[in-house]
């Protein structure tokens, strides 16, 4: 199924489709320590890295034979040094990690997938002078299989589906005996063939009330998939914005991240067969209170209580990092899409083009205000393309995906997503390189969201009289593509090993 785009009103609609990207990259000057798509992007979340959502992907599965599925990837715990032992990167057992789906366009979740984690200490000991002494390390020998006797701490998780409100809806357990998370990639001596080991933790799951076949889930450490010329970008764009797209190094290539990866039949996510568009986002929540125990144990280092309180939120990439003002970043992380009109000024009057013009006077910023085209797509979706509700959608920020647009095979994906589907703002599906299955119609790992948003922010879709620099090929000079990733589930590459260095 292809998007139903008539030529009448094509300019308005294609501008809106492209403009969704502009709302995702609206500042570059550092105020707090900020990293990548949504890494350490708000003051409060820097204090709690285990619940820091870093990237969110949602796309039609392009593994051969999986055309009827959608893959969702929620990444957490940024900037993991591969050698980050001895405790490495457990998920927070006192946190609630969630993936939300809106299939009605009201800005409220209709489906929620909930992940809860549990860390179990085996308390391995060795004999020392006639006494059994607990070891200080994560493992005491090579690791293989799901329950190796040499592993000191095992991490398991549960997966539930909630239909309706996340706290008030009908909650059911996704069935699978013993969902386990693979140990982080300690090193080659501990885990000689990590990817073979990790793939044994890909689980087929049966989702209650979900037709269309079994789903798949994998939770574990992966190599950081996001790519950006980070240092220079935040240093007042200390690079050549019209230079080679691949001239600089992607510094994130040296770190890992923890991924919650879920593949679900499309039919499970849709309101009905005639409504193919969904919106999605990920959140993490903690209990309202956390009290330090004066005598902590491994199982109970703190006492937590109170209602679940959202502390991290991520839909469209770069929004809280580079759109929202510092004074509202923590509020955005705690907010729900249905309440997003409170942040509309950050989209209608974007600051990035003005700041780029300040740094590069020849690059004139667009002069059209307010940017109502951005509001249409950033908050409501584009009619006949990726708008969920066809009548009166609630303005709400989330990543929208038209599941009716066929996935592009990995070998034919364009890292500029839908960019080359437009010529001077006019939708041209037969234009060379056109890839309508890419960002901002969902997001795949190989989509170069930074270059896309830079160009659109400077007016790629606007007339030259309004956007004199709109046709310039802006870039952060760090690039990537689908070739960096696997062509099969879970798509993201194995994490970097802690050893040897």
PLM regions with names:
Residues 10, 23-26, 218, 310:
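Residue-level detector of alpha-helical transmembrane segments in integral membrane proteins
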Residues 15-30:
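Bacterial N-terminal signal peptides
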Residues 1-13:
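N-terminal secretory signal peptides that target proteins for export/translocation
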Residues 34-501:
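Surface-exposed extracytoplasmic segments
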